[in-house]
């Protein structure tokens, strides 16, 4: 779901899930780093009265209010960039979905942030799976995702967060999983 099927046999279906290491995150982390460091250096240049930037001279700016504003934007941009780089280094959200008929178990595994929830692992019985549910919302912020409906639990998301997968890919993955588990596909 969001990744390729790693192992598929008549007994085991394993699907890798892409986490935070996506091109869009690398792109925005790079842009935020450049912008944040640039604003930070511009603010510090106005404070020290010494040019710390290569591309322009910001020593002529008054520290209050322009330099303070530049420092604020620099700290904010660098914080966002740091968060993005950290999530990519930890590969938050990555993992796998494994459906094992031999052991009769469904294992949903994801990596989280450090702490007690670093390893997120949900294990259910295949017999408890009621259906595979496809959720499709179009509009400004489209959402296309697959969920596993399990008895006495809320729906478990199977697809990665972020960019929605194509409709045909969603249909194919949902149908493949429903066929493998022998349950209905809902929502299409």
Swiss-Prot record:
GO BP field: photosynthesis
Domain of life: Bacteria
InterPro entries in alphabetical order: PSI_Ycf4_assembly
Transmembrane segments: 26-48, 63-85
Keyword ATP-binding: no
Keywords of the record: Membrane, Photosynthesis, Thylakoid, Transmembrane, Transmembrane helix
Subcellular location: Cellular thylakoid membrane
Topology class, membrane: Multi-pass membrane protein
GO cellular component, as recorded: photosystem I; plasma membrane-derived thylakoid membrane
Function of the molecule: Seems to be required for the assembly of the photosystem I complex.
Homology family: Belongs to the Ycf4 family.
Record protein name field: Photosystem I assembly protein Ycf4
Originating organism: Synechocystis sp. (strain ATCC 27184 / PCC 6803 / Kazusa)
């Amino acid at each position: 779901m969001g990744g390729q099927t790693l192992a598929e046999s008549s007994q085991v279906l394993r699907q890798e899930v892409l986490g935070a290491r996506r091109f869009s995150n690398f792109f925005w982390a790079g842009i935020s780093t450049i912008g944040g460091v640039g604003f930070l250096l511009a603010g510090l240049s106005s404070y020290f009265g010494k040019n710390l930037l290569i591309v322009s001279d910001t020593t002529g700016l008054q520290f209050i209010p322009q330099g303070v504003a530049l420092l604020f934007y620099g700290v904010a941009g660098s914080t966002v960039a740091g968060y993005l780089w950290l999530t990519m280094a930890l590969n938050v959200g990555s993992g796998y979905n494994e459906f094992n008929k031999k052991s009769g178990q469904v294992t949903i595994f994801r990596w989280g942030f450090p702490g007690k929830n670093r390893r997120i692992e949900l294990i259910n019985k295949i017999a408890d799976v009621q259906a595979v549910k496809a959720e499709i919302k179009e509009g400004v912020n489209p959402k296309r995702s697959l969920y596993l409906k399990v008895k006495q639990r809320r729906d478990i998301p199977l697809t990665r967060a972020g960019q929605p997968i194509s409709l045909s890919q969603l249909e194919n993955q949902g149908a493949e999983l429903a066929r493998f588990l022998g349950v209905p596909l809902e929502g299409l």
